[in-house]
Amino acid sequence: MTKEKKVPRRQLILEALARELEQNPGERITTASLSKAVGVSEAALYRHFASKAKMFEGLIDFAEESVFIRINQILKEHSDAQTRCARILYLLLVFSERNPGITRVLLGDVLVGETERLLARVGQFFDRFETQLKQILREGEMRSEGRPHALDSAISANMMTCLVEGLLHQYLRSRFKASPLQHWEIQWRLLSATLFPDS
């Protein structure tokens, strides 16, 4: 007879927070409502997290780990810049669609009134994402895939990041009804024709 693995309380709290953020778009989540959702006292929440800011940090940590570990796998599996960029952008859109509550955190929607450090953390998430794209484009140029690039790699990376962030904002604005992947194939085709004209 196999024993069910017990989920750590810390993880249960983060899952409940993400769920509350998804189910209550536009609303602030209080520790009182969160403790009710988890089924523990507020004191029990604070035994695992010193503050609500630490809970949000836990969700940011999860997003960073999930996205950037997968990006590293994509870089190992594919060598051409166009495929790498396409898969990395798609990855973030899929992650967002599957984790609407965390999307609210990454876009800073629920961080108003929280510590400045949290806004800096989500800023770093997108900066790191954009830097990764820029590096891919530069490596592609060195291998002459861009021959030479129609646009500067920094501008191209910024354009891709802006498109994805914009799609995530639309997803949030629709209260998670309009998928960020809704027109992605066509959008990517139009964008890649500009960024990779020789492909």
Residue spans for each PLM region:
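N-terminal intrinsically disordered/low-complexity leader segments
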Residues: 1-8, 72, 144-145, 173, ...
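Generic hydrophobic, amphipathic alpha-helix propensity
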Residues: 9-17, 34, 59-63, 67, ...
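Helix-turn-helix
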Residues: 12, 23-54, 58
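Short, hydrophobic secondary-structure boundary micro-motifs
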Residues: 30, 104-106, 146-150, 180
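Hydrophobic alpha-helical connector segments
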Residues: 58, 73-98, 153-160
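Amphipathic alpha-helical packing segments from all-alpha helical-bundle domains
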Residues: 65-68, 72-73, 116-143, 154-158, ...
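C-terminal peripheral helix-coil segments that are non-catalytic and often amphipathic
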Residues: 94, 98, 131-139, 161-199
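Amphipathic alpha-helical segments used for helix-helix packing
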Residues: 97-117, 169
